[in-house]
């Protein structure tokens, strides 16, 4: 903050007020002043600095002249010294470093023992610890030298800080090694005695160098530790394996490069990022993707190199530096080459290394940013002539308008109001009336042009009054135009300007002098809340002469041409208003903009996105088109500056219409060109020539006018939304699917499009050409609206996600943890900050090394290294309180030593460093934090930590462990503990500090600042901070028990803002130190308070240990362990003083779970299993969705009133009042209290508010939030990293817990269980080198202690409410007026339809039809999902079923299906045609079959959950035998066909209008009833939840009604006689080849006849089977029956079996055999024996169907497949049958080799010697091939039923001397012989159901028998169908259904007619050939049908030919 009052106006503010920036002009000013000559550049700054320097610089000059007398020193710029400063270490601190690492290892080993004890990993005696791999004796010098450098410089800076605390503005002078430093906070001098050079710089430059040394030390230390660990045991260290010596070499090369290239050298460093990116692309992508990018990049580097020298010479001309040498081009090129080579060696083709190196450029220091030059670059960019294309702008506007329409339809179920409907065509008016919009596929660019003409009416209002939300925007503001000179030091200004300024300053009001938004209001005594609205409505902002724009550099920005614009307060508030309106009203319609997501959400989105675009999940659609995908990451050059009024206004005008304003959203474009832009860097004043008015000063570098473009920080949101709309246009024009995430100019775009792969185009080429084409399209689209893509930062890839510096490839994230710990070090915040905060920061930053299973050990060692350094070394040198801190620490350690009876001091320290900070120890990271990130109860966690620690700590005396807990429980009641409501989110990173004290300091600061405010508003509000909590306490003081949360709820429902936020706004940043410097609010007293706070913290442990009462009994378990949960509860209750209080204590997973490594599924615990079979799981993706139970969300039910009307504050206020009503339900006086609060905060009575409140909250709610208030002694907090929150509805553990806790919500215990389990797996894997297959976490019941919510007694004192809410007026949310309320709740009478049905509505749910309502709501919910899925295939695919499992457990299945069917027909009903027509109904149901399978997966997942299954089996027992979604789909569709229509509830909106109008019309036709329309006000999902809640309350128990009917065995498994089923299979014909030719050219016995057939005729006799029909071409009994007789196996092993048809045939041939089944689990294929189940009725003969196995374990080419083959069945593999389709020949041999390995090594199989057989499918190749070693082929079978043109045969293999497989010619000739000689035989029996299923799947609605009439009916249907233009998803790609259907259907019908008309013939290839030759449309047939459809077609053809008479 820059105070402007005259007394201190010349306060020296260093450039460090822009964090981390090294200012060029300041450096120039310092040097020029000290030398008396121009230093870095000859410009106005150096001139002014020489003529009239500022006082501080003069003081520095005097010091400099007295200290340094030498004359012949060479002057250089700071960067030239970098290399020398970095290498300057005169003392070697190696011993200190060794000592620190050794101690760190000792401390870590104790923590490691704790972890191993908890995880039950016993270490053997000869292997003491993995920590021994880090050997202190051989620390490499690339680690130690950086430590020494940092240590010395840090010591110097600390010394300077101590001086400065004592006496502000001191200067210190000291020599380190060969360099002499003169340091002061306003400038430094460095002189090298070695090279005789001298340089001048800002204090920030020295700090930057210190930080760089620290970063390099941290990085190198990490690399060394990690490599030492990995070398000895892979997986102990980090994933990346950088080489330390090389990293060091890189530092040195770059330092020396910068040292010769000066400041200009940083332009090269900036390009390193791109170079590393090109390395990354080289690893992850195919060549064509990466080379283009790499070449662009290298060209860019060379260009930069060529320019450097010229730039430098130009800059230094006329300065001291002019004579210095500048290296030639070749020298620099060589150095640069060296640096790039080193980077390349470091990356070493490893993606983790590359990701890690991405942090690299922050380790090289920072350039000086030249402010004026940056500003000139901005000016240049704005003057570029733009050529815009009108058509493109119009399309852009149309797309933007469409987005808004979609947004309104989705949120408000209506279009926005439109002024000029007549511009729309009939088609759009139809959408308008139907309240819907077309899907992406139906749009064309014409639509956008048409929509661009639409004008909206006002929909949103501008807030009437300014409220604090608007004000609390921490944006700096510029001084107004006449005070602009306050920015520069007065000495720099000419006298006349100085005098005039003093006068202006004196006359202007206080508020104009400030530079912070908040103070702008605080100091305004005429402030009126209605002013802003007037200012905006009258459009005064457009002609405001006072407007000025001052530009400042962005913090830490490397490039030139990015500046940050500031405006005066008055204009700034208009901008804040515009941004706020956008964020609230328009941004929600653009989900792609990332501005609205938090980090965790963002990370989740990225995970989903990279998952979707992973190369592994590519697939073809139903047309067999390959879906090409690519991702494009673009960066637009000068994004903000490229916008002009023309490009902003196309969309801004639309937003203006919606808000009823004029030019509010692009007003800056209208005013800025007329204002002056000025560079307001303190040390860069303009040349004034004595002119005061800046509008009259002539243009120069750093001051210009007529700025045309946009500027950073203007309307980022609007521009991002324009970019989204532009991509919409591109997507529609090119017919591709675009998924984008945008953040301003940074865009990550995924494109996908189905393409045909033709000759010579493989998948990579298809992806590449799509990427390049789309990149061009995007580039051109941007070009048309005046933007240019940056070449070096735009890249295309197949499968690399890159957003905000996080790299994900193949769906795996590369976290680069070293980047996160570069800044770890002592005093990580600031001087005054608590040592405790510093420790917390070290703790949480080092934890980054553990996330995602990186490395526990590296994190431990690094963390303890710095913590030990901080506590034991740095604490002595604390500038304010070093001695006191150290004394206090020694005292604490002495007491600890005595208490535990420890002999050695080092052991005491080891113990203390592992005691959690909550108890006054030195460990900020409690044990649980390495395993889960959030906890409901910190106290229990700390107790658990102590209990584990004392258990493993062997150095303490007997009994001291118990004594410790007794001491803990005998702590005095805390006299000062009051109910403090913490000001911060309890989950924030870093500690709460002492909650009480912090809020005291904050309150003191805020109150004093606020109460000084002359503005009445703020004055009154200030009282709130001093009194509010006490007052709120009084309202509820008579209510017992006091529930800590109750107070908080009260506190939130009264209109308060949190003090913390205001403090930050005033002081500008969170640190107390800044409060000290920048506000007068804190004085010496506060400093003392802060110091005593630190001392209190350090003495906490000694206070705990000082009292120990022996008579306390500790709660213990049977085995003597402590029950931590109870200890913590007792402690919590005792530490409150004189209040009856309910402390909610939750168990800690560390103590309440026993970890067992076992694979027994009977254990009653939570099972975590490994999801891959590799030895380690590092860097692998886990399962895509959690695999235990379903996730639960807090669901609040809010009526569907028009929420758009409410402001954000009003919504929050309603929620808070809802909470209050919920918590205190039934307490006396509650109604009156609520009434007063409602009137005070919302302005309407409770009665009116009631309908708006959320309907319910879960029991969880109290528990969840109660922990946010806790006693003063125990503040703590953890970073939220991953929260998982599961219901264990279905696991056995649920029973155990329900028995104990009843219906109480036990979620709390488990919200971290999964997260913890996964981390445990990862840690066990790191420590032992292999990860357990499975672990079970078994809850220990006595450790789990859950309290019921309390019952409150007593009554409220509501008299205070009025006072509190009137004190708070500025903070109160907007009032609601009755008109608004009426709009929201009253049904509107307008537009009453004449139709009788519309007027008669009644509620669907009337109190007695609970189950029916639930079933109906759920059915409608699923139908809704269907329509959503068909409309937009969006990236953020939701897991729709989640959270609905419990609801389904209560449904009436009959009603469910009926409503589902009815709703479906209404949603998809006919356009034209009679809806009651049977065909129409069939048509809709058949459409359902074609819906994308992801819907069926979700649906089946929910319905097949055990508890839902139990319920549905009351209606249909068959559900018990269903497995997998395919079977479920058929079963469900059968039910739909036969069910009746039912009444459907329809949702109405706030105006009580029906939402789905068109659907209701069809519904009324359908039912033709006179009963009224049944409606519901809630949306379907909310309704379902609410009713489930009611049902549960009614029956008050969770369990689902038990089965009332007993099942007969026949019902569960209908008896099917296998021998009868045998008749469904045709007889097979085959030829056995015994001794075949091995010469490939053999022509022996070739037949001359060659059939030319195109269709797969081999399926002609397979019409009895639906999913697969292998059993029709091959039979075990026919082929190898004799062998089977000899072997007599009891079990057949089928692998690679698909739908199990061959297995079904074998089951019919051998009725007594059992089966083991395996089939590759692939998303697109069957991995369940559906066909087997269909033929044989049930599955009880399949012993092991492979349930629950992962994909790898079902793949016969993977070793694990064979390892797990005996997991259930323990019989030998006597005969294994393999029908797998292998991609290539190698896979076949892989499978054979693995089979051989298995049968030769397996215990079970080896007992049979070599008598084991494998009967497998093989595709013969051109030449004959040898089998793998020791595998022999006995016979080959060629089947008549194989594809004629293929080379498929079946080979029988056994163990023995290896021989050859048959070759292609051999098999081919045998096939032709079979084809010529044999007819296909027909099965004896026809199964009508199967034939019908085949017909239906070929052509929906096709019925048997197929005759002339049936085909005519189908043709008639086609004409009806063509009205449908909806979009379906077919095989993953979206098509317009009507076109797709008519093409396919007409083709099929024509062929069937041809078959009808053809004669009956023998089924052989002669006849088939004749059929094909007589059919004219063969080409069309083959083009329009995919291979699967052709097979179905032939099956149906076979059935027709067979049934001919």
Swiss-Prot record:
Domain Mononegavirus-type SAM-dependent 2'-O-MTase as annotated: residue spans: 1662-1857
Keyword check for Protease: no
Disulfide bonds: none
Molecular-function annotations in GO: ATP binding; GTPase activity; metal ion binding; mRNA 5'-cap (guanine-N7-)-methyltransferase activity; RNA-directed RNA polymerase activity
Gene Ontology CC terms: host cell cytoplasm; virion component
Signal peptide segment: none
Pfam families: Methyltrans_Mon_2nd (PF14314), Mononeg_mRNAcap (PF14318), Mononeg_RNA_pol (PF00946)
Binding site for Mg(2+): 635, 745
Enzymatic reactions: RNA(n) + a ribonucleoside 5'-triphosphate = RNA(n+1) + diphosphate; GTP + H2O = GDP + phosphate + H(+); a 5'-end triphospho-adenylyl-adenylyl-cytidylyl-adenosine in mRNA + GDP + H(+) = a 5'-end (5'-triphosphoguanosine)-adenylyl-adenylyl-cytidylyl-adenosine in mRNA + diphosphate; a 5'-end (5'-triphosphoguanosine)-adenylyl-adenylyl-cytidylyl-adenosine in mRNA + 2 S-adenosyl-L-methionine = a 5'-end (N(7)-methyl 5'-triphosphoguanosine)-(2'-O-methyladenylyl)-adenylyl-cytidylyl-adenosine in mRNA + 2 S-adenosyl-L-homocysteine + H(+)
Domain RdRp catalytic: 628-811
Catalytic site: 1263, 1673, 1779, 1817, 1848
Predominant cellular place of this UniProt entry's protein: virion
Keywords: ATP-binding, Host cytoplasm, Hydrolase, Magnesium, Metal-binding, Methyltransferase, mRNA capping, mRNA processing, Multifunctional enzyme, Nucleotide-binding, Nucleotidyltransferase, RNA-directed RNA polymerase, S-adenosyl-L-methionine, Transferase, Viral RNA replication, Virion
Record: residues binding substrate: 1696-1700
Region named GDP polyribonucleotidyltransferase: 902-1379
Entry's cofactor comment: For RNA-directed RNA polymerase activity. Mn(2+) can stimulate de novo initiation but it is inefficient at supporting elongation of de novo initiated RNA.
Claim: Lipid metabolism is one of the keywords in the record: no
Subcellular location field: Virion; Host cytoplasm
Cofactor: Mg(2+)
InterPro entries: L_methyltransferase_rhabdo, L_poly_C, Mononeg_mRNAcap, Mononeg_RNA_pol_cat, Mononega_L_MeTrfase
Quaternary structure note: Interacts with the phosphoprotein (via C-terminus); the association of P and L forms the polymerase complex.
Entry function: Responsible for RNA synthesis (replicase and transcriptase), cap addition, and cap methylation. Also performs the polyadenylation of subgenomic mRNAs by a stuttering mechanism at a slipery stop site present at the end of viral genes. The template is composed of the viral RNA tightly encapsidated by the nucleoprotein (N). The viral polymerase binds to the genomic RNA at two different sites in the 3' leader promoter thereby initiating either genome replication or mRNA transcription.
Protein family per UniProt: Belongs to the paramyxovirus L protein family.
Domain notes: Contains an RNA-dependent RNA polymerase (RdRp) domain, a polyribonucleotidyl transferase (PRNTase or capping) domain and a methyltransferase (MTase) domain.
Protein name: RNA-directed RNA polymerase L
Organism, as annotated: Avian metapneumovirus (isolate Canada goose/Minnesota/15a/2001)
Gene this protein is translated from: L
